[in-house]
């Protein structure tokens, strides 16, 4: 049995997919797409090593200890070159995680022809009339190249050392004078590029699990600046002591959302030792945090917030706070509830030394079936 390693390319920005969630984090059942695709291929062969390129290594590592991860580059070629540094097997298989449904039959065709050339690649024939600059091309000579592809590792490394931009391994190998062998590709191995492509693939739907997070924050009164809650000015001078603008509600809610998605906490994301967050707009930081949560495949279901303050009274501001949260997070207002309570003059809150906020949120996986 030939010694083969597997590289899965999952560091793309999903620009053409045009959704808040990166396509590699779409959930198929409970698995993000990148993991589903990698599990699928890894079930076909005892690979020597499996390497996944990533733009979010810390988060991906939460899912498995079975693979190695490496930060991707700005282009496909850069990402592949970095991943190849970890590979020493004779052959390497490279695939895009966006090709989710590669079959065992296609995989076997690649393996069976391993000794035929320097790179074995699947390709589809073109059935439709094809024009270039309004002139018909000979479609019999046109191939639609797919992945996974298997290459001789040393030759692929040498090809990429030219620092040219190759869009796949076969063109890189061919540029070195290497021999390419084509096997029959398949429709199911088409790349998921645009959100409309989801309708063409029979993928498992995201599970209906719900993820709950809580956030709690406390701040002391004492700054002669506006008191802000959810970006709404409550009082012109009763400001809270903080590195940022002191919006304790926004801080609590940020922590709740990050916690539900298992993405750490506000202190990790926006440390108070970093001067770029000095007097920062906390609602803008909340939005940025939620963008990160959506990027990895989640969306909000609802928000419930309890503000604990002896003073000032908040009854007249609750509606404005709910509206501002809804606008910031692009969430229906009927999914947001803000409550206010005192501590019956007990403790530091009762002594009007500060205030606290407890936030609870529920998240679900982004439902890509609605696209």
From Swiss-Prot:
Binding site for 4-CDP-2-C-methyl-D-erythritol 2-phosphate: 217-219, 243-244, 265-267, 270-274, 341-344, 348, 351
Catalytic activity, as annotated: 2-C-methyl-D-erythritol 4-phosphate + CTP + H(+) = 4-CDP-2-C-methyl-D-erythritol + diphosphate; 4-CDP-2-C-methyl-D-erythritol 2-phosphate = 2-C-methyl-D-erythritol 2,4-cyclic diphosphate + CMP
Enzyme Commission number(s) of this protein: 2.7.7.60, 4.6.1.12
Cofactor dependence: a divalent metal cation
Annotated site residues (Transition state stabilizer) in this chain: 16, 23, 243, 342
Function noted in UniProt: Bifunctional enzyme that catalyzes the formation of 4-diphosphocytidyl-2-C-methyl-D-erythritol from CTP and 2-C-methyl-D-erythritol 4-phosphate (MEP) (IspD), and catalyzes the conversion of 4-diphosphocytidyl-2-C-methyl-D-erythritol 2-phosphate (CDP-ME2P) to 2-C-methyl-D-erythritol 2,4-cyclodiphosphate (ME-CPP) with a corresponding release of cytidine 5-monophosphate (CMP) (IspF).
Official protein name in the record: Bifunctional enzyme IspD/IspF
